[in-house]
Amino acid sequence: MPRRHQPEKHPGGSHRQLRVAETVRHAIADILAQGQVHDPVLEGHLVTVPEVRMSADLKLATIYVMPLGGRDTADVIDALDRNRKFLRGEIARRVNLKFAPDIRFRVDERFDEAERIEKLLRTPAVQRDLAPDTDES
């Protein structure tokens, strides 16, 4: 009996997961940009949504956020968690899915990691190692 073709594994999930995640990302970014969440903490911050990851069954969306300037991240996450029910309802209205995904918020730490690597690359020891050899022996 022939084996069924196994789809190639994608690092971020299937094409459908990636497509739905991007749609959810656009929806949540629009909601936050338009100031539709009436929370004093969120009204004082611009929040970026660089990534959303969907579970395989599309029932859970992990939304990575970063307040502009990188300050008060814990307060922003708490405010988003307090407004989770409203945000989930808004996502359900904007994204055409059988089930509205449950949502959870996480701080996107990629910016901090990139800054740490950039700082490391600028250290004198690394600069010395990266400099071209001028020794012609």
Curated annotation (Swiss-Prot):
- Report the main location listed first in the record: cytoplasm
In UniProt terms, what function does this protein have? One of several proteins that assist in the late maturation steps of the functional core of the 30S ribosomal subunit. Associates with free 30S ribosomal subunits (but not with 30S subunits that are part of 70S ribosomes or polysomes). Required for efficient processing of 16S rRNA. May interact with the 5'-terminal helix region of 16S rRNA.
Q: Under the cellular component aspect of Gene Ontology, which terms does the record hold?
A: cytosol
Q: Where in the cell is it found?
A: Cytoplasm
Keyword Cytoplasm belongs to the record: yes
Q: What is this protein called?
A: Ribosome-binding factor A
Q: What's the subunit arrangement here?
A: Monomer. Binds 30S ribosomal subunits, but not 50S ribosomal subunits or 70S ribosomes.
Q: Which GO terms describe its molecular function?
A: ribosomal small subunit binding
Family assignment? Answer: Belongs to the RbfA family.
Keyword Cytoplasm, does the record have it?
Answer: yes
Q: Which domain of life is it from?
A: Bacteria
Q: Which PANTHER family match?
A: RIBOSOME-BINDING FACTOR A, CHLOROPLASTIC-RELATED (PTHR33515:SF1)
Alphabetic keyword roster = Cytoplasm, Ribosome biogenesis
Biological process annotations from GO? maturation of SSU-rRNA
